[in-house]
Structures are given as C-alpha cells and as structure tokens.
Amino acid sequence: MKKLFLAIVAVSALSSCNTTQPLYSWYNYEDATYQYKKKSTEELHVKMLEQYQKLIEKQKGTRGVVPPGMYSEYGYELYKAGKKEKGLSFLKKEITLYPESEKYISRIIKQLEK
C-alpha cells in the first residue's frame, strides 16, 4: 500500500511539472516596441518592423496564427513608413483572420485613405 501511495505521489508530482505552450509566440515584441516608443529613431523603427515581421512569419504558438492586432499594428506602421499598399494589405489581413475587428479596422482604413 505504501509503495502504491509513493508511486501515485511521484506520478502526480512529475505530471504537474509539465508547462503549457503559449497560444502565440511574441519573441521580442515588447522590448522592440518599448524601445521605439521611448526613442522614436529611424533605426529603432526599422528594428521594430523587423521584429514584427519575424513575429508574423515565424509563429510557433499552439494556435499557429499571428496574435490578434499584430497584422493591424504592422500594417499601420508600414503605412506610416510610406509603404501604403503593403500596409493596407496587412490591415485587411487582420480583418480576414479576426473578423470581429472589422468595424474598428475598417474605420482605420477609411481614415488612412482620406
């Protein structure tokens, strides 16, 4: 009986150590965004855009898709950087992937196209 109890305790202890994989991979998103917002230099803007692109291209979370708002944020930043068509296409991808954002993103697109 004592051996059975120890076996159950050991199995439950080992199984509780398993960590779950996050839904989305964020890589260095927070740091890149913070650094750019802190000092808005062209070099930091390029680094931030590279980080966003990496996040979009190499998504390794359990869902396997880009986090909500990422396409729109990347698209908006591209639009501000002068890559208007590419920026608008990413804003539209946000609507495709997350239809619940359509009202909000459509307003942003409408404002940008004025």
Where are these regions (language model features)?
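Structural register within alpha-helical repeat arrays
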Residues: 73-74
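Bacterial Sec signal peptide processing site at the extreme N-terminus
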Residues: 11-34
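Residues that mark the junctions of alpha-helical repeat units in TPR/alpha-solenoid scaffolds
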Residues: 48, 66-67
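Helix-turn-helix repeat elements of alpha-solenoid scaffolds
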Residues: 40-53
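Flexible helix-coil transition and linker loops at the boundaries of alpha-helical arrays
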Residues: 21, 55-65
